[in-house]
């Protein structure tokens, strides 16, 4: 059994950079009620600061159109939908992390598209019109929301241009041209606005180096570096509805190494102090991988949440909701979607893991690859432990003994558990027979799959509490230790022994 003696004082702060941003399906989905219901739930229970998604300039949001005037095609900018979308975000206390993409059809140089909703991934046929579009969009944001507000936003140029699926021919020099035109357009509106890139996925980190040298050589504005991080391998099985992918042997450490690698590249660049934003991360890059619905995903992500903030300025979970349509409209309630929240506002195990980390304090007392222990400002202790199990089979438990110093004698302990049994709506759905389009009754039942709660009162011995904890397979558990402020003596004539079946 592992024994951990938690120090009485922390020497550093727990960096909650995972709260900075969260991902979303294309922005046009924010016009749907269920999308906003999910975002409201996420903001109430977790509270992210920014939200990032594709499709700002795609045709369904409707910003860019061309109309014929006196025989000439001229741009027309329509902000009806984007105003509604951003208004909804701000009302839920979350700001946009703007991604400029994809290409409006009327401005596209080709017809190559990506996703069910056909985001165009070709360069603009007229860079002057593209520049004018960026200026118009940014200027409109400032006019509507005010310069001080928009200066807090971040503007990212495109999405994964190192992949041929997302940028025609994955042409690096063409992307650099797009970035330069876009960044200069943003800064022409206001030099204090924040713009960055190159928003690549893993496997092409030479893009980071080349991008920063390009910006230095041409004096192109760059305020941050962005990259994506996933750790699943190529699928070993594909079906009409699912991708099955193995994770790396030590996936959490692999992802953290990706964070460190990019940070090192930035330090070696002409801009060594630029912020690094991981604008997408998850276990799998596929929106139809069942791992996203599981307790394993929660245990995996717990490790990343515990340490990722030491290496990057933000890391944005992809995504908050299963209202998402890259691979068509979801074909079942649980379909392997990226979201923290499944359809019908049903929290997944990973959602609960995020709420557990949201309960942690700022003072970091202890951390290793399986737990994190913190102290809150009020002196209470909050810890998250996890047992990531990659192998198949039952059992596979882990025992831990924590020796935790406390400054009070009477102690209230609350433990919340998410694992293969508790807080696992995917398990309940499978027990129902995996209903593709569940009945209203089933939809009412599934949200009841909440974390298991255990409580007890103890007295500290010599200023410490000893906790023996057994973690089941893929469990994530939150332990909160607070001082008991006993008011029992204020109840005149109190005697539980007078209640049938109870003793004093």
Swiss-Prot record:
Gene Ontology terms for molecular function: xylan 1,4-beta-xylosidase activity
Organism domain of life: Bacteria
Record key words, sorted: Carbohydrate metabolism, Glycosidase, Hydrolase, Polysaccharide degradation, Xylan degradation
EC number: 3.2.1.37
Catalytic center residues: 160 (proton donor), 280 (nucleophile)
Matching InterPro entries: GH39_as, GH39_cat, Glyco_hydro_39, Glycoside_hydrolase_SF, Glycosyl_Hydrolase_39
Pfam families (UniProt xref): Glyco_hydro_39 (PF01229)
Reaction(s) the record says it catalyses: Hydrolysis of (1->4)-beta-D-xylans, to remove successive D-xylose residues from the non-reducing termini
An individual GO BP term: xylan catabolic process
Enzyme class: hydrolase
Similarity section: Belongs to the glycosyl hydrolase 39 family.
Protein name as it appears in the record: Beta-xylosidase
């Amino acid at each position: 059994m592992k024994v951990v003696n938690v120090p009485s004082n922390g020497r550093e702060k727990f960096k909650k950079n995972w709260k900075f941003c969260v991902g979303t399906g294309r922005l046009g989905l924010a016009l749907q009620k269920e999308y906003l219901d999910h975002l409201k739930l996420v903001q109430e229970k977790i509270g992210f600061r920014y939200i990032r998604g594709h499709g700002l300039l795609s045709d369904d949001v409707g910003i860019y159109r061309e109309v014929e005037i006196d025989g000439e095609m001229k741009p027309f900018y329509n902000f009806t939908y984007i105003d509604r979308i951003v208004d909804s975000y701000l009302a839920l206390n979350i700001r946009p992390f703007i991604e400029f993409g994809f290409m409006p059809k009327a401005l596209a140089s080709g017809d190559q598209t990506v996703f069910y909703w056909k985001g165009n991934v070709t360069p603009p046929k007229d860079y002057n019109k593209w520049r004018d579009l960026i200026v118009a969009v940014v200027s409109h944001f400032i006019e509507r929301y005010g310069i001080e507000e928009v200066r807090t936003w971040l503007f990212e140029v495109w999405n994964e241009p190192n992949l041929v699926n997302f940028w025609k021919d994955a042409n690096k020099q063409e992307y650099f041209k797009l970035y330069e035109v876009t960044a200069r357009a943003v800064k022409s509106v206001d030099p204090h606005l924040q713009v960055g890139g190159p928003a690549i996925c893993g496997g092409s980190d030479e893009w980071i180096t080349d991008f920063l040298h390009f910006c230095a050589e041409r004096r192109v504005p760059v305020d941050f570096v962005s990259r994506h991080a996933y750790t699943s391998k190529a699928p070993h099985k594909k079906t009409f509805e699912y991708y099955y992918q193995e994770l790396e042997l030590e996936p959490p450490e692999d992802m953290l190494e990706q964070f460190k690698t990019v940070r090192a590249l930035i330090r070696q660049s002409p801009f060594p102090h630029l912020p690094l934003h991981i604008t997408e991360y998850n276990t799998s890059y596929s929106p139809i991988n069942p791992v996203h619905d599981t307790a394993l995903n929660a245990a995996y992500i717990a490790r990343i949440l515990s340490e990722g903030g030491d290496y990057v300025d933000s890391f944005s979970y992809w995504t908050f909701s299963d209202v998402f349509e890259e691979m068509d409209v979801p074909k079942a309630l649980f379909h392997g979607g990226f979201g923290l929240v499944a359809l019908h506002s049903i929290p997944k195990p990973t959602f609960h893991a995020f709420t557990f980390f949201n309960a942690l304090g700022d003072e970091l007392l202890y951390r290793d690859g399986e737990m994190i222990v913190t102290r809150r400002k009020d002196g209470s202790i909050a810890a998250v432990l996890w047992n990531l199990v990659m192998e198949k089979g039952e059992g596979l438990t882990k025992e831990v003994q924590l020796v935790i110093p406390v400054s009070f004698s009477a102690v209230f302990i609350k433990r919340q558990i998410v694992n293969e049994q508790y807080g696992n709506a995917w398990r309940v759905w499978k027990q129902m027979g995996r209903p593709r389009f569940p009945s209203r009754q089933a939809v009412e039942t599934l949200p009841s799959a909440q974390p298991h709660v255990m409580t007890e009162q103890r007295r500290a011995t010599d200023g410490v509490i000893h906790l023996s904890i057994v973690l089941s397979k893929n469990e994530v558990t939150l332990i909160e230790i607070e001082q008991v402020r006993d008011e029992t003596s204020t109840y005149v004539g109190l005697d539980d022994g007078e209640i049938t079946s109870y003793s004093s």
